[in-house]
């Protein structure tokens, strides 16, 4: 069966997310480029780039959408016990470029979509104040983290990595605690998987997700939320 997709041109506009295909789930458009302005415009509409080696740039808006409620996130007893023992240091926006690079390099070439061009775009978005990271440290070595895009009171998670057990889980835990105390309302995780489900992610159908996005994207998060800082004290 033929698939008809919109090819993006020079304009940074996108089709409506409601035009996304059901199979493959959420595929909306192809082409264009990875200009940071285009990427940011996509996030403001619930659209993100994701494609593999040898593929054109593909743009997605899947349904259902995997999300976390930062206010409702509850770390497991075992994770709390682990962190009390290890006392990993956790920071915000202290090494965003390195986190982005490690999210790519810790995966095989076949597994990662985060190629050099994509990394360059997200690093530029970080320089502009739109892309943020959480870092987990052990003995001054970066052992885990995550990064994503802030859109008002919505945080769009992009990728995470772990070099030691539980490091990415701890990054997510501290991110949720930090957002919950600074008017962050929702974390978008794009597509559900068993790992996200085990951490408490739940799904929203497209209508519900888009309505939340529209209500949150123009709301201000607390001033200073994404200033570089240590988050270790944010978790009791």
Curated annotation (Swiss-Prot):
Catalytic activity of the protein: N-terminal L-lysyl-[protein] + L-leucyl-tRNA(Leu) = N-terminal L-leucyl-L-lysyl-[protein] + tRNA(Leu) + H(+); N-terminal L-arginyl-[protein] + L-leucyl-tRNA(Leu) = N-terminal L-leucyl-L-arginyl-[protein] + tRNA(Leu) + H(+); L-phenylalanyl-tRNA(Phe) + an N-terminal L-alpha-aminoacyl-[protein] = an N-terminal L-phenylalanyl-L-alpha-aminoacyl-[protein] + tRNA(Phe)
Q: Name one GO cellular component term.
A: cytoplasm
Keywords, in A-Z order: Acyltransferase, Cytoplasm, Transferase
The molecular function terms of the Gene Ontology recorded here are: leucyl-tRNA--protein transferase activity
Q: What is its EC number?
A: 2.3.2.6
Q: Which InterPro entries match?
A: Acyl_CoA_acyltransferase, Leu/Phe-tRNA_Trfase, Leu/Phe-tRNA_Trfase_C, Leu/Phe-tRNA_Trfase_N
- HAMAP family in alphabetical order: Leu_Phe_trans
Q: Name the family.
A: Belongs to the L/F-transferase family.
Q: What does this protein do?
A: Functions in the N-end rule pathway of protein degradation where it conjugates Leu, Phe and, less efficiently, Met from aminoacyl-tRNAs to the N-termini of proteins containing an N-terminal arginine or lysine.
PANTHER family per the UniProt record, alphabetical: LEUCYL/PHENYLALANYL-TRNA--PROTEIN TRANSFERASE, LEUCYL_PHENYLALANYL-TRNA--PROTEIN TRANSFERASE
Write down what this protein is called: Leucyl/phenylalanyl-tRNA--protein transferase
Origin organism of this chain?
A: Vibrio campbellii (strain ATCC BAA-1116)
Instruction: Name the gene.
Output: aat
């Amino acid at each position: 069966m033929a698939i008809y997709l919109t090819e993006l041109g020079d304009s940074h506009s996108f089709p409506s997310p409601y035009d996304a295909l059901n199979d493959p789930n959420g595929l909306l458009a192809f082409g264009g480029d990875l200009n940071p302005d285009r990427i940011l415009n996509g996030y403001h509409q619930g659209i993100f780039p994701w494609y593999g080696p040898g593929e054109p740039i593909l743009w997605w808006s899947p349904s259902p959408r995997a999300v976390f409620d930062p206010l409702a996130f509850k770390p497991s007893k075992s994770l709390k016990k682990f962190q009390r023992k290890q006392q990993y240091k956790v920071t915000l926006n202290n090494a965003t470029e390195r986190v982005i690079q490690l999210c790519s390099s810790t995966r095989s070439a076949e597994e990662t979509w985060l190629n050099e061009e994509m990394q360059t775009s997200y690093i530029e978005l970080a320089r502009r104040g739109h892309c943020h990271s959480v870092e987990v440290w052990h003995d001054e070595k970066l052992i885990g983290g995550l990064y994503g895009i802030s859109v008002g009171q919505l945080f769009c998670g992009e990728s995470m990595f772990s070099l030691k057990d539980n490091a990415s889980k701890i990054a997510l835990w501290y991110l949720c605690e930090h957002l919950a105390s600074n008017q962050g309302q929702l974390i978008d995780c794009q597509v559900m998987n068993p790992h996200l489900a085990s951490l408490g992610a739940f799904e929203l159908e497209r209508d519900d997700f888009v309505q939340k996005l529209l209500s949150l994207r123009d709301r201000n998060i607390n001033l200073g939320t994404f200033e570089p800082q240590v988050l270790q004290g944010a978790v009791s």
